From Swiss-Prot:
It holds the Pfam family MecA. It comes from the Bacteria. Belongs to the MecA family. The N-terminal domain probably binds unfolded/aggregated proteins; the C-terminal domain interacts with ClpC. This is Adapter protein MecA. Transmembrane segments: none annotated. GO terms for molecular function: protein-macromolecule adaptor activity. It comes from Listeria innocua serovar 6a (strain ATCC BAA-680 / CLIP 11262). Enables the recognition and targeting of unfolded and aggregated proteins to the ClpC protease or to other proteins involved in proteolysis. Homodimer. NCBIfam families: PRK02315.1-5.
Length: 217
């Protein structure tokens, strides 16, 4: 498992599916077994105590993302209390029964994948593309077949990131695969999430970003 300090308040975990198996878990356990996913979370937090000077006390925001070869988990100290749209506040300073119930609810909400049939007409799927050279982004803006994408451009730590959303009412699985293939001709799939970019990145072009890049460059 890899642990990366994003900033003073945020830690990123990356655990490969192979590492999961070596720890006695499998993907089915993590997605569908509440006790197993809770056990994995606490294992990660225990390991954090030895790897990083990060005190998991007070409310936390936790976001889980499934990648091709593993899981990415962001743990951020919240500046305010209360439940928000993208996380769940958890107090770990005293592991009493109430905290355990919050953890169970958090893990059930974040580790269980959304079933496609539960998505509404206006729901979207998200993809983050990383560019090391702005010229690649300019070239992408002129590509065909991407007109219905919802795009937003950020800069973060010296790189450019394009947050791409595929509206469910305009993209089926086949169309998404085709669009992603085009996107990957110009950039790299990023491990960052839209939440992280919105929180810590700088907006260069709001929606529709690709259209604006094409217009000005």
């Amino acid at each position: 498992m890899e642990i990366e300090r994003i900033n003073e308040d945020t830690i990123k975990f990356y655990i490969s599916y192979l590492d999961l198996e070596e720890r006695g878990f499998n993907q089915e356990d993590v997605w569908y077994d509440r006790e197993k996913s809770e056990e994995l979370f606490w294992d990660m937090m225990d390991e954090l105590k030895y790897e990083e000077e990060f005190s998991p006390e007070g409310p936390l925001w936790i976001q889980v993302q499934a990648l091709k070869h593993g899981l990415e988990v962001f743990v951020t100290k919240a500046t305010i209390g209360g439940k928000g749209e993208d996380g769940f506040d958890v107090t770990l300073s005293s592991p009493d029964e109430l905290a355990e119930e919050k953890i169970e609810k958090l893990l059930e909400e974040n580790f269980n994948p959304v079933k496609k049939e539960s998505l509404g007409e206006d729901d979207t799927l998200e993809f983050i593309l990383e560019f090391r050279d702005f010229e690649d982004l300019i070239s992408l803006s002129r590509a065909t077949g991407l007109e219905n994408l919802v795009t937003k451009l950020y800069s973060y730590q010296g790189k450019y990131y394009l947050n791409v959303e595929f509206p469910e009412n305009k993209y089926d699985e086949s169309n998404i695969d085709n669009a992603v293939s085009i996107l990957l001709e110009y950039g790299l799939e990023s491990n960052l999430t839209g939440y992280m970019l919105a929180e810590y990145g700088k907006v260069i072009f709001d929606v529709p970003a690709l259209k604006q890049v094409r217009k000005y460059f």
